[in-house]
């Protein structure tokens, strides 16, 4: 692990904490996602890594490698210096139609590529879309922890995803087409960019998941009067927000929609995108699937110490006091992660209650 040096912490997610690291030789910056060794290393983690490794597209965060430390499994990936698209909307309030289209075109291009590779994301949301640091930012899809490859795994059945973005069919306990659920989530992302609010959340009571679920099932949304968007854009949203996934617009159809095609950058045209779909398109990873699976299997063994140690088990990060502070920071971040997981559990509980009550009906 002498290859990397720490630059700074960059936050926490569903499975662990993340740090910005620098490759000592090349000075290249990478984002390093840390997942504590032991029971947290499950099939979702393995799936995320294998799925991510297979993807090579400019609108998808590049996977680099996995590394085992004494306490954590570390996943190295491309660093997106522009941060989350979510943060950009929070500071802007909402986007103009042209700006929303600019990012939506990139999102659809990335999702289209994932689907062609037989991978559906299942947790598309603004927080999982990052931006690079260029003046005209390039959108990057990240976080494949909930993705499901139809080549390697069974059809999606579990209820995952973020309440505000979740498609009606995901709330039913029947099997669903993960690709069509991704289309719905892309529609929610577009709506949020245009309006600055979630389409199916009650603004007065956003934590009321039951109300959100009911509005999703009834496809109850509206464009506020103060938001002026074209009829073309309204038409696209109305074709995405369709409860019956068989009648919903597909990714291929979105790519032919007049609103999508307006001002489409040359690099996003079908001709330019064709290069990424070639079988010989190599992976960015230097590790084979077998090497990765062995490292992930080894990571299932819990760390020898009960508490996290400084540097995530890499050592060499300053004096002993520094290490203790580092460990406390890590523990605080992991506590935050656990709190987020509790929120997920609360959501799952609500979904189960709705299932049990028989309120969910898919036409």
Curated annotation (Swiss-Prot):
Keyword Membrane among record annotations: no
Feature: compositional bias, Gly residues: 310-319
What is the E.C. number?
2.7.11.1
What is the protein's name according to its record? Serine/threonine-protein kinase SRK2A
Q: Which residues form the Protein kinase domain?
A: 4-260
UniProt enzyme class? transferase
> Example GO biological process term?
response to osmotic stress
Basic and acidic residues: compositionally biased ranges:
348-363
Q: Where is this region: Disordered?
A: 306-363
Question: Which UniProt keywords are given for this protein, alphabetically ordered?
Answer: ATP-binding, Kinase, Nucleotide-binding, Serine/threonine-protein kinase, Transferase
Keyword rRNA-binding included in the entry's annotation: no
Subunit comment for this entry? Answer: Interacts with TOPP1.
Summarize induction of expression: By abscisic acid (ABA), salt, and osmotic stress (at protein level).
* Free-text tissue specificity from the UniProt record: Expressed in seedlings.
């Amino acid at each position: 692990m002498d290859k990397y040096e720490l630059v700074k912490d960059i936050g926490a997610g569903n499975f662990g904490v993340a740090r910005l690291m620098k490759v000592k030789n090349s000075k290249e910056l990478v984002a390093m996602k840390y997942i504590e060794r032991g029971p947290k290393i499950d099939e979702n983690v393995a799936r995320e890594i294998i799925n991510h490794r297979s993807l090579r597209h400019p609108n998808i965060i590049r996977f680099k490698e996995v590394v085992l430390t004494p306490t954590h499994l570390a996943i190295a990936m491309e660093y997106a210096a522009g941060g989350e698209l979510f943060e950009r909307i929070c500071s802007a309030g909402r986007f103009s139609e042209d700006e929303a289209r600019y990012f939506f075109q990139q999102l659809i291009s990335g999702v289209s590529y994932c689907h062609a590779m037989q991978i559906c994301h299942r947790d598309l949301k603004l927080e999982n879309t990052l931006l690079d640091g260029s003046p005209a930012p390039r959108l990057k899809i990240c976080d494949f922890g909930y993705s499901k490859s139809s080549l390697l795994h069974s059809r999606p059945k579990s209820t995952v995803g973020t309440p505000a973005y979740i498609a009606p069919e995901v709330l039913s306990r029947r099997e669903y087409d993960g690709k069509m659920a991704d289309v719905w989530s892309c529609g929610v992302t577009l709506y949020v960019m245009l309006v600055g609010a979630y389409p199916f959340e009650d603004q007065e009571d956003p934590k009321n998941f039951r109300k959100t679920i009911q509005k999703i099932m009834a496809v109850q949304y509206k464009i506020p009067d103060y938001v002026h968007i074209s009829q073309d854009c309204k038409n696209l949203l109305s074709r995405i927000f369709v409860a019956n996934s068989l009648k919903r617009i597909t990714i291929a159809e979105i790519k032919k929609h007049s609103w999508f095609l307006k001002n489409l950058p040359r690099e996003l045209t079908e001709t330019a995108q064709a290069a990424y779909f070639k079988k010989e398109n190599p992976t960015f990873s230097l590790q084979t699937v077998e090497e990765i699976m062995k490292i992930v299997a080894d990571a299932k063994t819990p760390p020898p110490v009960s508490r996290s140690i400084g540097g995530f088990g890499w050592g060499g990060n300053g004096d002993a006091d520094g290490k203790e502070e580092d460990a406390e920071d890590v523990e605080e971040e992991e506590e935050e992660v656990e709190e987020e997981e509790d929120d997920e559990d609360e959501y799952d509980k609500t979904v189960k209650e709705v299932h049990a009550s028989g309120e969910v009906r898919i036409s």
